[in-house]
């Protein structure tokens, strides 16, 4: 899996296409993530410009965990991670977390 390059600190909205209402456990879905990235010299100019720069596309494949839902342009995992409007340094698709065992230990 290719890691996303470092992203400057800013608020981003992640868009997943195609939009899938729900998916089953273990499904692997290809997400096209569009993140508007400002170059360092554009940080000061972005206050003056009304239109943001053209978003750059990143592609990643994520295995969906149990009860995860993908709807519209946001992705919500079972542990409550919601990617819409997160800070850029945390706005990357999290890996599917393994289920915590709640029963007695085996063996």
Curated annotation (Swiss-Prot):
Region Disordered: start-end pairs: 86-107
Additional observations: Partially overlaps PTC2 and YER088W-B.
Protein's recorded name: Putative uncharacterized protein YER088C-A
Species of provenance: Saccharomyces cerevisiae (strain ATCC 204508 / S288c) (Baker's yeast)
Origin organism lineage: Eukaryota, Fungi, Dikarya, Ascomycota, Saccharomycotina
């Amino acid at each position: 899996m290719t890691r996303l390059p470092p992203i400057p600190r800013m608020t981003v909205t992640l868009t997943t296409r195609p939009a899938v209402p729900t998916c089953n456990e273990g499904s692997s879905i290809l997400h096209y993530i569009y993140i508007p990235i400002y170059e360092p010299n554009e940080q000061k100019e972005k206050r003056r410009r009304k239109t943001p720069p053209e978003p750059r596309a990143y592609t990643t494949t994520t295995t969906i965990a149990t009860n995860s839902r993908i709807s519209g342009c946001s992705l919500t995992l079972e542990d409550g991670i919601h990617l819409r409007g997160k800070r850029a340094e945390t706005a990357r698709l999290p890996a599917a977390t393994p289920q915590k065992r709640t029963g007695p230990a085996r063996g």
